[in-house]
């Protein structure tokens, strides 16, 4: 079931580039542990956290030339930007991995996450996923 929601224009606090294969592997691996993933950007690092009754797992990716993760925009490096999202939906989005080498992740507090795949000369594919409510 898909809801059509109007998303107002916004300036994102954090925009980063990450290898698409790393994002796909991370989402697939963590989807075995939980239905929800917390994504947090703080300083020069990105954290992916899942938890359930038996296990907590956090994967931290620091900005580095070697691992391919880089901030394109980081308006407030001291601000913590985070949200909880459906990992099942992120795994579905990651099926576009073969379209490009790197993805862009747009993050802002209390706002949907946007994942952008640039497809060579054809354009781009953007996926938007609203944060999960804790209600």
PLM features: residue spans?
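Structured all-alpha helical bundle cores of eukaryotic regulatory proteins
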Residues: 1-15
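DNA polymerase processivity clamps
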Residues: 12-65, 74-135
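Short acidic, glycine/tyrosine-flanked loop/strand segments centered on an H-E-D-like triad
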Residues: 1, 63-70
């Amino acid at each position: 079931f898909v809801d059509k929601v109007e998303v107002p224009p916004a300036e994102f606090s954090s925009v980063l580039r990450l290898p698409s294969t790393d994002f796909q592997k991370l989402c697939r691996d963590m989807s075995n542990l939980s239905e929800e993933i917390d994504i947090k950007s703080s300083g020069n690092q990105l954290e992916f956290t899942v938890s359930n009754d038996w296990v907590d797992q956090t994967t931290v990716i620091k900005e580095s030339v070697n691992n391919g993760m880089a901030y394109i925009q980081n308006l407030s490096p001291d601000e913590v930007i985070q949200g909880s999202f459906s990992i099942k939906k992120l795994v579905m989005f990651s099926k576009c991995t073969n379209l490009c080498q790197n993805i862009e992740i747009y993050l802002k507090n209390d706002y949907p996450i946007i994942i952008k795949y640039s497809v060579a000369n054809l354009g781009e594919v953007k996926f938007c996923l609203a944060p999960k409510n804790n209600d």
